[in-house]
Amino acid sequence: MEGDAPVAAAAHYQPASPPRDACVYNSCYCEENIWKLCEYIKNHDQYPLEECYAVFISNERKMIPIWKQQARPGDGPVIWDYHVVLLHVSSGGQSFIYDLDTVLPFPCPFDTYVEDAFKSDEDIHPQFRRKFRVIRADSYLKNFASDRSHMKDSSGNWREPPPSYPCIETGDSKMNLNDFISMDPEVGWGAVYSLPEFVHRFSSQNY
């Protein structure tokens, strides 16, 4: 990371979202939190929706380390089965990550987030390496559906309290979350990247 460029960019950047504590948030429903954030951006014409993407992070084993998460204070990572963040590629050339579960700034300059939360694949066993499904926000709003059944145990009890608003569904589906979590490029919407590919595609710096 070179100098204070991300800090300088952040200083001139107007967030696309309300403050973190004013965002729609339900613990362990990151896919819906980001859907609601996309909806907010669509309804408040501050930035073109086409500058924004939902980013699903997972892998074949559904075991991905992410650092700087509120669920794990200190220096260690959380091992999620999947996680979802919002990526804003601003017309000013700087990208920002919106992660409602991080202890990093909200929003956070892309390069800062990658360095602190993802670190490097070189230091991670291959089975834990992250992949990224990047979906345009308009496509995510149009196509995502979840009946929240993945958050119920075998007895039908909620593992975590569900959001108070109705389930998100489309005319075609009530539940397609697994198509977004899947890192099979032949499935679902958007494009799938490795971490180096993701950084190369969206970083403002030459890694």
UniProtKB/Swiss-Prot annotation:
Q: Which organism is it from?
A: Bos taurus (Bovine)
Self-association state and partner proteins as the record states: Monomer.
Per the entry, what this protein does is: Mediates the side-chain deamidation of N-terminal glutamine residues to glutamate, an important step in N-end rule pathway of protein degradation. Conversion of the resulting N-terminal glutamine to glutamate renders the protein susceptible to arginylation, polyubiquitination and degradation as specified by the N-end rule. Does not act on substrates with internal or C-terminal glutamine and does not act on non-glutamine residues in any position. Does not deaminate acetylated N-terminal glutamine.
The protein's UniProt keywords, in alphabetical order, are: Cytoplasm, Hydrolase, Nucleus
This entry's Gene Ontology molecular function terms read: protein-N-terminal asparagine amidohydrolase activity; protein-N-terminal glutamine amidohydrolase activity
**Keyword check for rRNA-binding:** no
Keyword Cell membrane recorded: no
Q: Where in the cell is it found?
A: Cytoplasm, Cytosol; Nucleus
What main location does UniProt list? Answer: cytoplasm
Top-level division of the source organism's lineage: Eukaryota
The cysteines joined by S-S bonds are none
Q: What is its EC number?
A: 3.5.1.122
GO CC, sorted alphabetically, is: cytosol; nucleus
Name this polypeptide is given: Protein N-terminal glutamine amidohydrolase
- The active-site annotation reads C30, H83, D99
Record-linked Pfam families = Nt_Gln_amidase
> Could you give a single Gene Ontology term from the biological process aspect?
protein modification process
Report which reactions are catalysed by this protein.
N-terminal L-glutaminyl-[protein] + H2O = N-terminal L-glutamyl-[protein] + NH4(+)
